[in-house]
Amino acid sequence: MRFSYAEAMTDFRYYIPLAQAAEAAGYHGMTIPDSIAYPFESDSKYPYTPDGNREFLDGKAFIETFVLTAALGAVTTKLRFNFFVLKLPIRPPALVAKQVGSLAALIGNRVGFGVGTSPWPEDYELLGVPFAKRGKRIDECIEIIKGLTTGDYFEFHGEFYDIPKTKMTPAPTEPIPVLIGGHADAALRRAARNDGWMHGGGDPQELDRLIARLRQLREEEGRTGPFEIHVISVDGFTVDGVKRLEDKGVTDVIVGFRIPYIMGQDTEPLESKIRNLEMFAENVIAKV
């Protein structure tokens, strides 16, 4: 089992020492959140809070995903950075291909390209992208980014994007794993066609259902190769629980040590955060 450390919506000056501490403690990865901006008004509900409340996001600092990952990659040597998750269809795919390809080449292929659609129509409006057909749009984005990060000439002609024969360098020396976030059936099918899935949390029974559905969809898609399953689960906090997750096919456990979905700023000191991640490494990672 591999373990990824998750921290978000905290003092952005903490990220560098936290990444260094996580690497030293034996974590395999660290998750990198994504948010462009906070809309003053929205009719949408936040998908990962019980009541759909989104106000806790107001004023929370999010360093741009590629900028943060490059900074953390420069001060680590082994830690992998998994986007959790990048709002892909609001961005131009050719530019994202250049960003993620350059990043992976620069930091030694230590990038997990976690992507999803945004639940906020305001994100699309802000960046001048239609909210409609976002599922089809993200599929085209993924195909384009995969093609442009090979280092070979690639062209694409789709419903939303038209890419003439083009080569981008530098390219990573390994394919960048494409990990899909989301619990909807369309997201699960998209994950089944790609390299892995990123779980957004929830009760254990729901996780079992989602994993079973992923297995079914992979069979339908004829996919038999390696597949990453990244989950948030209470089972991830004990040695016995980790074994149960392994038996279900989970490859990566995402662990954090506070609930970020609360109003106000995070006041936990950096020293406390580091001690928490170190204690988990001593009590769980070292014993599995």
Map each language-model feature to its residues.
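Active-site-adjacent structural elements that line small-molecule/cofactor binding pockets in enzymes
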Residues: 1-288
